[in-house]
A protein has these predicted regions:
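Beta-strand signatures of extracellular beta-sandwich domains
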Residues: 493-499
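Aromatic sugar-binding surface patches on proteins
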Residues: 520-540
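Bacterial N-terminal signal peptides
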Residues: 13-25
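Short beta-strand elements
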Residues: 564-584
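Contiguous beta-strand segments within globular domains
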Residues: 467-493
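Short, compositionally biased P/S/T/A/G/V-rich stretches that sit at domain boundaries
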Residues: 442-475, 583
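Internal, hydrophobic beta-strand segments that form the core of beta-sheet-rich folds
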Residues: 546-564
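Extracellular beta-rich repeat passengers
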Residues: 32-66, 74-92, 96-443
Length: 584
């Protein structure tokens, strides 16, 4: 019989009602895949993929890309996800998914980029929701697809541990590809741990929509690193923009709508924990760290703005100053240093002829906002060739942070300024900056993990910042649980289940059916002989009031493949165990 007390001793705080692992892959020896044109069926890519022309995933089909897949992109090629279609691209820290140039000597602009289109809201048509879809449809530039709608919670899939390199092909003088273009993308889309590197235009740009992003690294792009327009309303946390020594303009370029600065819905980005690193040696105009203009709203906090040529912040035009006056522009609790040769603010406060602003940007940032500091953040290294953007010992970035909103998106206990604290570098393993990580070893001894594996490169005393993250939450009437991302060095078997408030234990089998556990020998594995694991659960809507009150525990047990559960012992058998709980 199972000892409930013993098993509970291994289960720790987090969230679970039930845990369903939605993507786990068997390692195979994949052949080369060559693609181009229309994808009109559910499709899976793995191994080496050659993108030979523009490739469009049509609705309602899903493109799934397995960990470690490398996509080599020919000139003029690009990947477009239509409205209603999805991309499920989930790598791991050890095996990221990489989109790169097919050239033996890769360079910026070798191919296009990735464009994802959704049914999220925009202000580009002048028609407010609710409205027929044809009235709120926008045609994207450079052939990036149609987008827009009235569903802010639309999902276009998942991008996680993905790298996008050497894109930005220029169609003509007015149209070029961003590394990652998000057009009308809804907030049910998951975008985290994405690097856009050496793009010959913007790194990431939002055209309307409601997408939220986290752990984004934009490096060495020639134009703006982080850009939005057309009524974009979304959130971001842990974002890095790093300019090279030869090109690059702004850290953030933020617009509402060029044609109508008051168009509804008005752009609004809530951004916490950004690190924006410019290069004030580049002989280039328009080198601001943050440029809010054309009536955008912005809440930028707990961020570092360092080393930009023209200014740290430059508020432009009447509509944007009006936002600042009425509290819709917040730039506070930030560290600003070494911009404009140490002056930090340009006296030219507006590019709008005939308009005199009621205050300067400097007055706004340093006086009206009361918690910004003009001090050296003391980062380990801002060298563009060998950066280490974590704050060093004694850094002012380790104190003075505001508390992010407690809205289930933001990591609210990130109590530091910038995208990193002094310990954890989330770029390790999967980016061009972070080197490689060894695969996670198969367990050889009893190991119980609280949130993240101990003695593994993701350990962090703050569990919310650790990756692989083991956490979950209830939002929009759904349960979402994340239980880590790994590539194991050899196959493992994975068991999972829940414990109810009355003490009964249930396991979940390969068909996602639950079974009362009375003897470990009778427990069925959820998956066997697996080397990759990515865990994500989205359950249908439910009525929380219908659940019995008490504490619900969840567990994930990883053992060497072929383990005989009849002889399994928690005191001596090798395993990894993750646990979660929520009390109603």
């Amino acid at each position: 019989m199972v000892s409930k007390g013993l098993l509970r001793g291994y289960l720790f705080k987090g969230l679970v009602l039930s845990i369903v692992l939605c993507l786990l892959w068997l390692v195979q020896a994949p052949a080369q895949i060559r693609v181009g044109g229309i994808i009109a069926e559910d499709t899976t890519w793995e191994g080496e993929v050659f993108l030979e022309a523009n490739t469009i995933v049509k609705a309602p089909y899903v493109l799934t890309i397995k960990p470690g897949t490398k996509i080599y992109c020919q000139p003029r090629s690009a990947l477009i996800i239509d409205r209603g279609a999805k991309i499920i691209a989930i790598g791991t820290p050890e095996e990221p998914i990489v989109f790169t140039s097919a050239s033996a000597n890769p360079a910026r602009g070798d191919w296009g980029g990735i464009s994802i289109n959704g049914y999220g809201t925009t202000n580009a048509t002048g028609v407010l929701c609710p409205a027929p879809i044809e009235d709120v449809t926008v045609v994207g530039e450079a052939g990036m697809g149609e987008y827009g709608g009235c569903d802010p919670h639309d999902s276009s899939g998942i991008l996680r541990y993905v790298r996008i390199e050497y894109g930005g092909f220029r169609i003509d003088g007015e149209n070029e590809w961003n590394g990652l273009t998000l057009q009308g993308v809804g907030d049910e889309t998951i975008i985290e741990y994405v690097q856009i590197d050496h793009n010959d235009d913007d790194g990431i740009e939002f055209f309307g929509g409601n997408a939220n992003v986290r752990n984004i690294l934009v490096t060495y792009c020639t134009d703006d690193q982080y850009d939005w327009t057309n009524g974009y309303q979304g959130k971001g946390q842990f974002i890095v923009a790093l300019l090279a020594n030869d090109a690059g303009r702004r850290g953030i370029e933020a617009d509402n709508l060029k044609a109508d600065n008051d168009a509804q819905p008005i752009s609004k980005a809530d951004l916490y924990n950004m690190t924006l690193i410019g290069n004030n040696q580049i002989p280039e105009e328009e080198g601001e760290g943050v440029l809010p203009r054309r009536g955008t709203r912005l809440n930028l906090q707990n961020s570092i703005i360092y080393g930009f040529l023209e200014a740290a912040v430059d508020i432009d035009n009447e509509a944007t100053f009006a936002r600042a006056q009425n509290g819709e522009l917040i730039i506070d609790h930030n560290i600003i240093y070494n911009n404009l040769g140490g002056e930090n603010f340009n006296p030219d406060e507006s590019d709008e002829k005939g308009y005199t602003p009621p205050f300067t940007t400097k007055e706004f940032v340093t006086q009206m906002m009361q918690n910004n500091r003009l001090v050296d953040p003391l980062l380990n290294s801002t060298d563009w060739q060998n950066p280490d953007l974590r704050p060093s010992a004694g850094s002012p970035a380790l104190s003075g942070a505001a508390s992010p909103p407690q809205d289930r998106f933001f990591v609210e206990n990130a109590d530091f300024i910038g995208a990193f604290d002094s310990q954890y570098d989330w770029t390790k393993g999967w980016t061009t900056l972070g080197g490689e990580l060894a695969k996670m070893p198969v367990p050889t001894a009893p190991n119980t993990y609280i949130y993240s594996p101990q003695n593994y490169p993701y350990t962090h005393p703050n569990p919310k910042l650790a990756r692989p993250m083991s956490d979950g939450f209830v939002e929009h009437g759904k349960v979402s649980v994340k239980v880590g991302l790994h590539t194991f060095s050899a196959p493992v078997d994975i068991y999972l289940g829940i414990s109810l408030p009355d003490g009964s234990l249930y396991s979940i089998d390969e068909n996602n059916q639950s079974h009362l556990v009375t003897d470990l020998a009778l427990v069925s594995a959820w998956r066997k002989n697996q080397t990759h694991s990515v865990y994500e659960e989205i359950l249908p809507e439910f009525d929380k009031s219908a659940l019995s009150p008490g504490t619900y525990w969840g567990w994930v047990l990883v053992v060497p493949t072929g383990t005989n559960m009849a002889s399994f012992d928690f005191n001596s058998s090798p395993y990894y165990l993750w646990g979660f709980s929520e009390t109603f």
